[in-house]
Amino acid sequence: MKNMFLFSCSTGLRFSDVANLQWKNVKTHNKHLFLEYHQQKTNTNEVLPLCAQAENLLRSLKRSGSKVFANEFSQNINKFLKRWCKAAKIRKRVSFHTARHSFCVMLLTYDVSIYTVQQLMCHSDIDTTKIYADITNKTKNRAVKKLPLFDKFDVKRA
């Protein structure tokens, strides 16, 4: 289950898409991996490039059966995550969707275009992606408010 969650953190895939991902969906181009898969929620075919972390995770898995995460127990994954977080002393509520959320917020935090993020997240409506952008704007606003004020006597005139 940990692998499924980390893979979603690295790809932004929904639980249903990670759970149904098959090895035949994993393709190679110029030694890099990407996914060609059928998205469960939107009933559309998608192509998704993979970051190095997602590639490394896939390459570390043993192929047994057609499903990529065949040995992962997808039932009760949120209960597993709760125990995992408790062991790590993480107090924040975490669900499988947190992985997808983290992927989106990380991209926006690193100033990836909101339109690119929309495509990677397979959001049909940009307004859905804008919800995540608002979160990063609030984070940025809180960050700059933490900066100290300059004392009027510390500022030298040029």
What label would you give each PLM region?
Residues M1-L6, K27, Q40-T42, R63, ...:
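Conserved catalytic core of the tyrosine transesterase superfamily
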Residues D17-V18, R93-S95, C104, D111-D125, ...:
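Active-site-proximal segment of tyrosine recombinases
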Residues M1-F15, A19:
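Basic, Lys/Arg- and aromatic-enriched nucleic-acid-binding interface segment
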Residues T11, N20-L57:
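Conserved tyrosine-mediated DNA breakage-rejoining catalytic core shared by Y-recombinases
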Residues M1-K2, S74-Q75, R91-D111:
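Short basic/aromatic active-site micro-motif
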Residues P148-A158:
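C-terminal secondary-structure termini that scaffold catalytic or DNA-interacting sites
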Residues Q39-N43, M121, D125-K146:
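Catalytic-site neighborhood detector that most strongly recognizes the C-terminal catalytic loop/helix
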Residues Q40-R83:
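C-terminal catalytic core of Y-nucleophile DNA break-rejoin enzymes
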